[in-house]
């Protein structure tokens, strides 16, 4: 899933600049409908490889839509946006609402599954998306995001030093989250805290909803100082948290302490990470070229997906070899690298 995210963002950014963001947006919606339709086959046909293929296609669709939407904002915000405050606000709102709805989707999926069954739920989602696709085909500007000069395929790699630095920082930032959040944390909650599948899933879904809510209001938290200094300061604040959680989990003698340390630390980490994420999302849209914006945004989110891929792989391996504490220490180390990389950002960023 994450591997296809790497490829999709890189190629999708080029397609968006060449063909227009309306086409990549509609392609993403269409692919998502196809992925859902693949799951409407009789249950006996739903083998693991088939479901994995549907999941991969769904991942491609999701990244096409995310890249298209975030790139489009740069062209939709009115000219003369003093201090880029409107741009920051809209990027944060889009980023936060997307993640909050992801968490809501966990509960909505469970409700649909209970009320109308698996195939009914899949069909309902496909029909809703078909309606959204119809609106998109009718209403989206045909030239949205299309570059005046069609970029060649070799231009998919960024030539901007600032964007390369920001992309590298983003890769380590998201690797630091997923190295302990994706595999290690759910397994720890199930095996050490004795939580069942629904409790683990429900808690993490609520965490994602809260995470998205904080992302949406990030401009109010950071104020107008949304630049290089803010990116460094917020990443530095985040770097300390996994290490503090790891130290807290080593304290012996109090049965309730690990629960308070881990769950409280997770909530605080989520809030600070959400601000970092919104801040970075704003910076890439602000720094991206105006003509062919999706080339830069696609390259940046390719680095994001690469960080998530590496973090996911490390999460399972580190948990097996060193437990949750090992993943937390590596997370802190990756965040220190994020801070070091961010120091190289241009001072006017």
Q: Which residues does each PLM region occupy?
A:
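Hydrophobic core of transmembrane alpha-helices in multi-pass small-molecule transporters
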Residues: 35, 46-65, 258-275
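Cytoplasmic helix-loop-helix junction between adjacent transmembrane helices
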Residues: 54-98
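C-terminal ends and interior cores of transmembrane alpha-helices
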Residues: 30-45, 237-255
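Helix-to-loop junctions at the C-terminal end of transmembrane segments
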Residues: 8-21, 113, 213-229, 319
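Short amphipathic helix-loop junctions that connect adjacent transmembrane helices
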Residues: 183-200
């Amino acid at each position: 899933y994450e591997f296809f995210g790497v490829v999709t963002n890189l190629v999708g950014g080029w397609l968006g600049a060449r063909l227009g963001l309306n086409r990549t947006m509609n392609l993403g919606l269409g692919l998502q409908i196809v992925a859902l339709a693949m799951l409407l086959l009789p249950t006996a046909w739903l083998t693991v490889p088939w479901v994995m293929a549907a999941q991969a296609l769904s991942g491609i669709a999701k990244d096409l839509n995310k890249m298209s939407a975030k790139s489009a904002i740069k062209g939709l915000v009115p000219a003369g946006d003093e201090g880029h405050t409107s741009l920051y606000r809209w990027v944060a709102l889009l980023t936060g609402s997307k993640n909050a709805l992801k968490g809501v989707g966990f509960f909505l999926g469970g409700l649909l599954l209970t009320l109308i069954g698996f195939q009914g739920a899949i069909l309902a989602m496909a029909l809703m998306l078909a309606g959204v696709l119809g609106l998109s085909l009718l209403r989206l500007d045909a030239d949205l995001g299309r570059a005046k000069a069609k970029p060649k395929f070799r231009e998919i790699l960024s030539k901007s030093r600032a964007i390369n630095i920001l992309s590298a920082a983003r890769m380590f930032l998201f690797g630091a989250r997923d190295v302990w959040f994706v595999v290690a944390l759910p397994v720890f909650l199930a095996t050490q805290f004795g939580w069942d599948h629904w409790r683990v899933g429900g808690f993490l879904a609520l965490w994602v909803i809260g995470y998205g809510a904080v992302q949406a209001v990030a401009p109010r938290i950071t104020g107008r100082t949304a630049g290089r200094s803010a990116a460094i300061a917020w990443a530095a604040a985040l770097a300390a948290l996994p290490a503090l959680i790891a130290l807290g989990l080593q304290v012996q003698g109090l049965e309730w302490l690990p629960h308070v340390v881990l769950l409280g630390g997770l909530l605080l980490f989520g809030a600070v990470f959400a601000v970092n994420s919104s801040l970075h999302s704003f910076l890439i849209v602000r720094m991206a070229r105006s003509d062919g914006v999706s080339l830069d945004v696609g390259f940046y989110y390719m680095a994001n997906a690469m960080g998530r891929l590496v973090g996911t792989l490390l999460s399972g391996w580190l948990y097996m070899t060193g437990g949750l504490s090992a993943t937390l220490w590596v997370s802190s180390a990756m965040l220190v690298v994020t801070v070091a990389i961010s120091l190289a950002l241009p001072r006017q960023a």
